[in-house]
Amino acid sequence: MKAYQREFIEFALNKQVLKFGEFTLKSGRISPYFFNAGLFNTGLDLAKLGRFYAAALMDCGVEFDLLFGPAYKGIPIATTTAVALAEHHERDVPYCFNRKEAKTHGEGGNLVGSPLQGRVMLVDDVITAGTAIRESMEIINAQGATLAGVMISLDRQERGRGEISAIQEVERDYHCKVIAIVTLNDVIRYLEDKPEMAEHLVAVRQYREQYGVTL
């Protein structure tokens, strides 16, 4: 695990974005951890979050021309990541996001920011069912752009109803790479170095045994 990944986990824990305990998910599964990126909700939080996304993007090796943030959670992520790439990596990358409702006056349309073109890196918080990705693909294709990859904060590495995860479905269906700042395996490695969190480590390992994808 790289230093920025460990720092991201600590950042998420400090902000209670990542919590351990017993949580009922929408799927009905009882999870020993919960991740809520909506709690990154201050200016300093967003500045730090952008730096983690930028570090992971520079680390992943996927070439891209533009950041796209799907409404609504992807909008601040795309914005802060673009700022971090410019300030910390000398990469001045254009960004774009969509409106849920098309505007009928002014500039009109449902896209805001730079023209949606070239190789697009879609940035979002997590992928649960892949619905937002599918909706975004319709927008990207309509503009004649191509999806270079998808960047998220956490990959739960968890099966859906079938044998693969929503992330693996996205990679299969759209022939792109999904990059995460951290994965569940990274969280487990972090817990392995924290003897005081041993009970959480046992619970997370058991959950992975039951619901984890085959990598």
UniProtKB/Swiss-Prot annotation:
5-phospho-alpha-D-ribose 1-diphosphate binds at residues 26, 72-73, 99-100, 103, 105, 124-132. HAMAP family: PyrE. It is an enzyme of class 2 (transferase). It comes from Yersinia pestis. Belongs to the purine/pyrimidine phosphoribosyltransferase family. PyrE subfamily. GO terms for biological process: 'de novo' pyrimidine nucleobase biosynthetic process; 'de novo' UMP biosynthetic process; pyrimidine nucleotide biosynthetic process; pyrimidine ribonucleoside biosynthetic process. This is Orotate phosphoribosyltransferase. Keywords: Glycosyltransferase, Magnesium, Pyrimidine biosynthesis, Transferase. The gene is pyrE. Gene3D superfamilies: 3.40.50.2020. Pfam families: Pribosyltran. It catalyses: orotidine 5'-phosphate + diphosphate = orotate + 5-phospho-alpha-D-ribose 1-diphosphate.
